[in-house]
A protein has these predicted regions:
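Histidine/acidic residue-rich metal-binding segments in metalloenzymes
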Residues: 1-12
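Short C-terminal domain-edge/linker segments immediately following a structured domain
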Residues: 2, 41-47, 114-121
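His/Asp/Glu-enriched, well-ordered alpha-helical/loop segment
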Residues: 11-12, 17-87
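C-terminal cap of metal-dependent C-N hydrolases
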Residues: 30, 81-131
C-alpha cells in the first residue's frame, strides 16, 4: 500500500490465470497456481481504495502501463477510437457461476456480493454492457 502511495509501485495487474478443475481439485501443493480475476479485478481495486485514493489506483492499471510501454494514451475526441470503461465504484453485484464469463470457476470471490461494478466497456465501435 505504501509503495503505491509513494510511487514505488507503478502498475497493478490482475495476473488473470484461469485453471481447469482438474488442476485445482487436488492436494494444495500439487495444484497449479492461478485464479480467474479479470471479472473481479475492479471490485478488488474498489476495496483497496479504502486505503488508497481511487484516482491513484485507476492510473496503476490504465494510463501508467501505457506510459511505461510507450503506448499512446486514448482520448475521448471526435475521430479517435474509443477505449474506455464505464464504472460505478458504489455499485454492487453478485458474482456467481451464472454471471461468470470464464470457462473456469477457480475464484475465491465466487458467490460473494462485491462492491464496485463495471457497467460497460467501449473499444473501437463495440460496446459491451456488463449485466
Amino acid at each position: 500500500i505504501d509503495g503505491i502511495k509513494d510511487g514505488t509501485i507503478d502498475v497493478i495487474a490482475s495476473h488473470h490465470q484461469p485453471q481447469d478443475v482438474d488442476t485445482k481439485k487436488c492436494e494444495f501443493e500439487k495444484a497449479n497456481f492461478g485464479i480467474i480475476s479479470i471479472q473481479t479485478f475492479f471490485s478488488n481495486i474498489v476495496e483497496l481504495s479504502r486505503k488508497i485514493p481511487l484516482d491513484i489506483l485507476l492510473k496503476t492499471f490504465s494510463s501508467k502501463p501505457k506510459e511505461i510501454l510507450g503506448i499512446e494514451r486514448s482520448s475521448i475526441s471526435e475521430g479517435s477510437k474509443a477505449s474506455f470503461t464505464i464504472f460505478n465504484s458504489d455499485g454492487s453485484w453478485d458474482y456467481d457461476e451464472k454471471i461468470n464469463l470464464s470457462k473456469s470457476i477457480n475464484s475465491p470471490w465466487l458467490n460473494w456480493s462485491l462492491k464496485g461494478r463495471v457497467e460497460a466497456v467501449i473499444k473501437g465501435n463495440k460496446i459491451k454492457e456488463i449485466i
